[in-house]
C-alpha cells in the first residue's frame, strides 16, 4: 500500500527564500485619491537605490499620453502598455529576461481581466518578483471592476488609499457626470475621460446623486 504523500517543511533554499518574499499588492481607492502619485513615488524609491522597475498601464488610457503614467500633481513616467488580451506573465517574464527588475508596478489595475490578475499572481509565485497594483475598487454604478474583484480575492496585501467626500467623510464611491452636470446611471464601464467627469463621494451622497438601487 502506497504511503500518503507529504509536504516538505524543510527550510527553503536561497531561491525559495526569494520567491517567498515576493507578494502581490493591491492599492485601491476612488477617483482622485493620488494612486498614480503613490505608484510613481514607489518606483522612484527603487530607482533612487539603484534598482530597476517595470511600469505597466492600460493601452487605452492616454490621459497623460500613450505609454505614460501621470499624476495630477504634474509628475509622470514612461510605462509599457497592455491590452486585455495580453499575457501579463509572458510580458513580465520577457522583461526579467532583459535584466534585473526589483518590482513591477501596474496602474489602472481595474482594467485587467480576471485571467490577467491570475497571471500576475503566477509571476509573483514563480518568478519571485513583487507586483504592486493601483486601481479603482468600484465603478460609477457601484459595481466591482473585474480586475479589482480578482485582486481583492488574490492579493497578498491590500491597502485602501483614502480620499474624502465634499461632506468630509471618507469617499468610497464615484459618480460619472454627464454634460448637464447630473450623475449618470447608465453607460459603458470602460470609458476613459477627464478627471472632471468623475466625483468621489461617500455612500450617503452617492445614493443621493444616483438614487437607490
Predicted features and spans:
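Residues immediately C-terminal
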Residues: 111-112
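Conserved P-loop
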Residues: 19-94, 139-150, 160-163, 185, ...
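Walker B catalytic acidic pair
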Residues: 108
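Conserved AAA+ ATPase core "coupling" helix
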Residues: 164-180
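Sensor-1/coupling segment of RecA-like P-loop NTPase cores
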Residues: 124-147
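Short basic/glycine-enriched coil/helix segment immediately N-terminal to the Walker B
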Residues: 92-102
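A short acidic, amphipathic alpha-helical/loop segment
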Residues: 42, 115-123, 147
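Short, positively charged and aromatic/hydrophobic N-terminal segments
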Residues: 6-8, 17
Amino acid at each position: 500500500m502506497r504511503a500518503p504523500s507529504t509536504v516538505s517543511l524543510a527550510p527553503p533554499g536561497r531561491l525559495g527564500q526569494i520567491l517567498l518574499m515576493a507578494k502581490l499588492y493591491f492599492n485601491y481607492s476612488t477617483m482622485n485619491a493620488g494612486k498614480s502619485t503613490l505608484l510613481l513615488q514607489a518606483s522612484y524609491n527603487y530607482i533612487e537605490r539603484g534598482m530597476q522597475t517595470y511600469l505597466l498601464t492600460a493601452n487605452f488610457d492616454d490621459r497623460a499620453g500613450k505609454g505614460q503614467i501621470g499624476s495630477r500633481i504634474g509628475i509622470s513616467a514612461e510605462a509599457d502598455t497592455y491590452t486585455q488580451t495580453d499575457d501579463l506573465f509572458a510580458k513580465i517574464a520577457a522583461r526579467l529576461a532583459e535584466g534585473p527588475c526589483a518590482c513591477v508596478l501596474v496602474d489602472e489595475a481595474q482594467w485587467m481581466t480576471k485571467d490577467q490578475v491570475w497571471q500576475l499572481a503566477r509571476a509573483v509565485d514563480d518568478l519571485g518578483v513583487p507586483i504592486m497594483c493601483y486601481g479603482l475598487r468600484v465603478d460609477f454604478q457601484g459595481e466591482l471592476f473585474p480586475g479589482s474583484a480578482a485582486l481583492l480575492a488574490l492579493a497578498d496585501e491590500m491597502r485602501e488609499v483614502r480620499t474624502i467626500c465634499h461632506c468630509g467623510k471618507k469617499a468610497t464611491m464615484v459618480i460619472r457626470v454627464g454634460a448637464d452636470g447630473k450623475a449618470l446611471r447608465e453607460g459603458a464601464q470602460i470609458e476613459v475621460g477627464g478627471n472632471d467627469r468623475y466625483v468621489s463621494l461617500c455612500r450617503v451622497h452617492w445614493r443621493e446623486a444616483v438614487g437607490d438601487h
